[in-house]
Each structure stands twice: as C-alpha cells, then as structure tokens.
C-alpha cells in the first residue's frame, strides 16, 4: 500500500515538489516548482536508515558499467530553462544525466545509476544553479578570484596584468607576452579563466598576434582611443579569427558620436559594456545602442539597481578608476557627464523588459566582483516591487522573471563569448560547474561550489570540532582548490587559433585549454529571455529615456534585500 504524507512533511524530507513555492533569500521573488523528475516513493536519499545503501538505492554497477561519480539528490534546479526538481548525475567533470537516480535492479525509471563508486551530495531543500560567469573583469589582483568563487562565480573573463595603470582603467591584457604570463598564472586558480587582448589599433597585425597568443576576445576602451578606425579594424580581425569584441565607447564624443560608433560597427556583433553609460560611453545617449540587433548589451554592477546612494558613490569611483584629478576642471566635467539619474533609472526597467541582456562586475574598476549575483537579484526584486508581475508570468509565482534574471549572469554571457556549449546552464554534457544554495541565502552565500564536478568551496564550521557545523561557519576553500586538482577541475578559454597552434604545450600550461567558438554569427536574438530591441531615444537636455515612445523612469530604492542582514557574520 502506498503511504500518504503531507506536503510539509514531504518537503522537509525530500525537498519541495511540483506546485510548492518558496522565497529567494529575503526578496519578494517567489518561485514555484514546475515539475519533478524524481519518482514518489522511490526517492533516493543518503544517510543512516535511508535509501542509498547496498542492494537498496545503490546498485553493484561499476564506473565502467555506467555508475556516475557523484549524484546530487532531489535538488531544485533554477535555470534559464526552467525551475524543476531532479536528481543530477555527474561523471568525468560533466553533467551526465538529469533525472531519476537510484538502483535499476530494485527501482523503476532509473536513468542515473548509483554505484559503490558514487559520492552523494544532499540536494534536498537546496537550490542548484549553474556557476556564474563574470565577463567584465579587470585582473588587478589575484585575490579577486577567491572573492568571486565564494560568491558563486565559476568563470571570469577580462583583461589586465595586475595593478598597472592600464589595467586599473581598462580590461585589456596587451600583447602576446603579457597574455602568456596571465595564461601561465591561470594554472594556479580554481576558476575558469579567459583573457581579452587590447583591441585599440587601426592596423590588424598587432591584434592578430594577441589572438594567436591566446586572447579569446579583444577589448576596445576609450582610454586607449576607441575611434571609428579602431572599431572597424578590431571587428574585422574578430570576424576573421572568431573572437568577441567588447567595447567601452568615447564618453567625450571626441572622435564621433554614438551614431558614428554604430556606423563603424557595420552591423557586426559586439558586446557593449556598461551600456547605460555611467561606466563609460558616449554621453548622454550611449544607452540607445541596446536597441540594436548586433549589440549584446551588458551592465556593470555599481548601477544595479538604482538606489538613493548610486549617484554619490559613482563620482569618486570614476575619478580614481580613470586616473582623473579633482583639481582639473575638465576632469571633473568628464566625470560628471557620465553620471545621470535618468539613464540609470531607465536601465532598471530595460533589464526588466529583457532589453539589457547581461550583468557583470567591472571588478575593482567601478565594480564589485563579489556582488554580481547580489546586484542582479536586487534589481529583480526592486522591479518586482515597483512594476509588479511580468505579463509573461503564467502562475502565482515569479518564475519567468527569475529565469530572465539568472540568464543575465549564466547563459547569456556564455553565448556572447562563444562558450555556451561548455558552461552557463544545467544541461547534460556541459561542465559540472555548479552552485548549491540554501534558499534563505540564495544569491548571497553559496553552500557549496563545484568546478568540473569537484567541490572547490563550501560553508564549513570549526575544523577542530567533532562535527562540521559548529561556529564559526563561513565559506572556505575545499580540496578541489588545492594542488594538482586545480589543474583538472578548471579550464582556460582561448581563441581557436591559439588552441590549434598548441598554446598549452607552447607555454607549458597545466590546465586544459578550450577554444571559444561561434562568437560572430550571433546577435541579440540569440540571447535567452533578454532579446528585446526597443527603439531608444534620449532627450539631450533632460536625459529622459524613452523606449518605443514610452518614458522609462522609476524611483531609487531606499532599502534593498540581500544586504546588511546577511553580512553581520
């Protein structure tokens, strides 16, 4: 006879199931489980007196015969593709199967075989997401990588050589020599890393040698001179060598206006950084380009979301980051021209509409590397409070909005940079770069981070305690973050040209190198749940922003979730 159990008791034992709802952290965002791929009455769970025991939920199957390396049981998957419950099997550092785990000799419907060689991670009552991808990194100091990992990021792309003044302002690793040194340094870190070369040149040779030297992208930055000629040259090299171009346009409008920049692009794909403009770009109307099909628009996190403190903190940030002098009137005017409450307010709404597609940090250069996820969900919560439910929602939940926002730091930057076939979502065959969350701490403090199927970070108590939970409990590096394991759980992304030329062997790299691909034959329409292309107009006198004729404005937030209450310890 089948047993009956209350929803509350079931959720407490096996985690929420179809129709159950839960809150994300302390936000107003409510998600609902859409479907459950496990089987009622046949759930697998590890522990004393539980299911994953020899001859019960654990089969005799060897690894060679098909048993997985790791099973994450009864996890609530939150992904751009949906919000659903499943067991997840990991093998060879990748997601082998999403479905029902157990012993096929004793249980029906098993498609993830648990064997004697299988480790178990309890996903009951936990949320599982893909690792985050920050595509706007200034590699100013290596300590950023630890902060990023402990926030739920597993991939970082950007440029720099350390605290050189070029790196303090621009995300470029200039020249093949510097790129080589950064690729060699990448071997030491439990993080997927990728580097952008300097794209500012009017002739192609110096750009081509950087791509061949391992750069997987090229960055055009106004501090190096983002002229129409440089834009055209950089995009031509990118088209020929299949790498993405990121652009920070000309704030001062010295070499042209936004229309001249768009004309120089000639409809070619480009990733536009901080498209609102506070982080840099044609003043006051760079935000217009988010309506172009060939532009992949992103935000950096200091303007996310618009709050009562946003404008004030930006001026000082800008003066430091761009090597400006408060005693020079022109420098002050340059800084003030970039900070506009009207365009920052509009940016909130454009994200909620799906017209801005990506959120990244701009680490230590007008951005906070450990706050990509927090700022994304704070924006989603602010828009939920101010704009209500999205028209696309189909139930008494915020599932569509949550899927839209998680895509901004997972699958969309991955697609934009040619690595969406490897990372960015929870899909069979992709790398097992995964983050496990307690729902109460979602987006703030991960419970566990896996990189290539290996645990690299987790919340951990006193190492001298008799059990792992006594205080102080905080995120600490795990075994995957040490020794030779680092070389095998993380990868380095490079251009196809460098990969085919044997960049790994040439530089003696220990980490596997993977080539980026298909960065050029894409447009905004390829970005998931964030591909709206409204006609944007900016009033040059008032800075008011309109999308398809509708004024975009909202009030700054005075209080945010996922903030001080989470950082008392």
Curated annotation (Swiss-Prot):
Co-factor binding comment: Binds 2 nickel ions per subunit.
Superkingdom of origin organism: Bacteria
Protein's UniProt name: Urease subunit alpha
Description of post-translational modifications: Carboxylation allows a single lysine to coordinate two nickel ions.
Residues the entry annotates as binding substrate: 221
Gene name in the database record: ureC
Keywords per UniProt: Cytoplasm, Hydrolase, Metal-binding, Nickel
Short name of any one Pfam family annotated for the protein: Amidohydro_1
